[in-house]
């Protein structure tokens, strides 16, 4: 008889191992699994473990040439999701050797590459990943991190202020540079290329880089503060992207930008390495994230995309506002904000954190709050995000009735007033409106901004609930 039993057998016989003790070097994943009717949860969980590691649909002869015990993913726990019918959290442990060192691309190809189209599952969502130090140590991570950035910019004890230049498409390079100058001159720390500003017929990248650099140096000379503009280096090829970053470095600017999901993790990691080697800060935009993370029961939660970015590398990343026009529930948002900034984050299911994450010495990333925010939100933003954050007001700067520079002044005055009030021990959550009103008495720019946006609200229920 042949020492090999052909045929199709249940995944759970091999891949469901409730007695497994997870190792410190394992990558752990929490999946929200919705099995098809009639598929038992253990089989569904085991199928996820199998299809995202060593398994295939039938027994194969070559299984005998390797050690499944050493290389297979294992579903080691399953729990029903409270309040949902036929939905489970399946916990899967992957041996470290399944992954190429320093490659977020390979990590995702393995863990989420194939299994999401699996027929036995109705839907599947990757809720969280535990990255062991043994793996995170193979990544460079953010080019510089929070402390180094503060030292480069010489700005301490407050959030940083930014503004996305609008209208995002259609301005000529010179007019674009003019808007950059006005915002920086008025008191912002940064201005930003929109995520879809790359190199279009109405404004080629090199012209934009030159005019923005000119704007930056002029504003720096006049204010005595260090200024930055996120020059978007995202391009159609990796070579072109690096070429743009090189030109930014030659201009002597402090920071470039990348769209990490549309650009891809391979390109992003290359750019992050270039930025560390050449002293450039790297601002990351998450364009396309909602395609992946917005559905509650299928896709990948943003906290996983945020962890992946910290490994791939970026110094800033957009992470929702909690108060503006885009998705983000407070506790869950603060959960992944901590995952971006802190060294050690405790498991806390109420904030959507399924695993304790120890980043050891990987630098942190500044969360960027951007999208539909204005001066009245400033106390809440200061309270929610604290000092280590970038607050970005696009329309909330450029929409000021007196123009861009007064819009920037209004935001800077509001921010400084909130920081001062907080440092004096006042309660921003309770007295926020009062603090802004007081400041607007001596700042006509702020008073005008307060008048324009006093009624604006984006009130819809958040989708991202636990």
Curated annotation (Swiss-Prot):
Ligand binding (substrate): 114, 164, 168, 286, 318, 370
Location within or outside the cell: Plastid, Chloroplast
Cofactor note: Binds 1 Mg(2+) ion per subunit.
Keyword Lipid metabolism assigned: no
Residues with site note (Transition state stabilizer): 325
Binding site for Mg(2+): 192, 194-195
Major location (coarse): plastid
Active site, per annotation: 166, 285
EC number(s) given by UniProt: 4.1.1.39
Pfam families from the UniProt entry: RuBisCO_large, RuBisCO_large_N
Enzyme class: lyase
Post-translational modification: The disulfide bond which can form in the large chain dimeric partners within the hexadecamer appears to be associated with oxidative stress and protein turnover.
Stretch forming the signal peptide: none
UniProt keywords, alphabetically: Calvin cycle, Carbon dioxide fixation, Chloroplast, Disulfide bond, Lyase, Magnesium, Metal-binding, Methylation, Monooxygenase, Oxidoreductase, Photorespiration, Photosynthesis, Plastid
GO MF annotation list: magnesium ion binding; monooxygenase activity; ribulose-bisphosphate carboxylase activity
Subunit architecture: Heterohexadecamer of 8 large chains and 8 small chains; disulfide-linked. The disulfide link is formed within the large subunit homodimers.
Protein name: Ribulose bisphosphate carboxylase large chain
């Amino acid at each position: 008889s042949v020492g090999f039993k052909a045929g199709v057998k249940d995944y759970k016989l091999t891949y469901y191992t409730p007695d497994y003790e997870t190792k410190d070097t394992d990558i752990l994943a929490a999946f929200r699994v919705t099995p098809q009717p009639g598929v038992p949860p253990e089989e569904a969980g085991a199928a996820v473990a199998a299809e995202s590691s060593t398994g295939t649909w039938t027994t194969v002869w070559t299984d005998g040439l390797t050690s499944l015990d050493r290389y297979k993913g294992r579903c080691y726990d399953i729990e029903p999701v409270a309040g949902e019918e036929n939905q489970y959290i399946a916990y899967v442990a992957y041996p470290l050797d399944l992954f190429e060192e320093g490659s977020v691309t390979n990590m995702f190809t393995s863990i989420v590459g194939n299994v999401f189209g699996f027929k036995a599952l109705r839907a599947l969502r990757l809720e969280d990943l535990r990255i062991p130090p043994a793996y995170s140590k193979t990544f460079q991570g953010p080019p510089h991190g929070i402390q180094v950035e503060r030292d480069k910019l010489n700005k301490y004890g407050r959030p940083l202020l930014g503004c996305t230049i609008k209208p995002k498409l259609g301005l000529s390079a010179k007019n674009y540079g003019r808007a950059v100058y006005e915002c920086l001159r008025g008191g912002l720390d940064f201005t930003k290329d929109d995520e879809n500003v790359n190199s279009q017929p109405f404004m080629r990248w090199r012209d934009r880089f030159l005019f923005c650099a000119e704007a930056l140096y002029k504003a720096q000379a006049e204010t005595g503060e260090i200024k930055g503009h996120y020059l978007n280096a995202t391009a159609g090829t990796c070579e072109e992207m690096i070429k743009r970053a090189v030109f930014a470095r030659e201009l002597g600017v402090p920071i470039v930008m990348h769209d990490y999901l549309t650009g891809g993790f391979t390109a992003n990691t290359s750019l992050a390495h270039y930025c560390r080697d050449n002293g450039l800060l790297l601002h990351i935009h998450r364009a396309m994230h909602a395609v992946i993370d917005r559905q509650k029961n299928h896709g990948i939660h943003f906290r996983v995309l945020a962890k992946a970015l910290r490994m791939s590398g970026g110094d800033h990343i957009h992470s929702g506002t909690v108060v503006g026009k885009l998705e983000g529930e407070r506790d869950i948002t603060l959960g992944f904000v901590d995952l971006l900034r802190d060294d050690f984050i405790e498991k806390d299911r109420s904030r959507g954190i399924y695993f304790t994450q120890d980043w050891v010495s990987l630098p942190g990333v500044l969360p960027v709050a951007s999208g539909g925010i204005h001066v009245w939100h400033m106390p809440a933003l200061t309270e929610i995000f604290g000092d280590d954050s970038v607050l970005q007001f696009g329309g909330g700067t450029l929409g000021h009735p007196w123009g861009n520079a007064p819009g920037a002044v209004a935001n800077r005055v509001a921010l400084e007033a909130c920081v001062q009030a907080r440092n004096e021990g006042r309660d921003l959550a309770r007295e926020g409106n009062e603090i802004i009103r007081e400041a607007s008495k001596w700042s006509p720019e702020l008073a005008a901004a307060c008048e324009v946006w006093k009624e604006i609200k984006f009130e819809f229920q958040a989708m991202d609930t636990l």
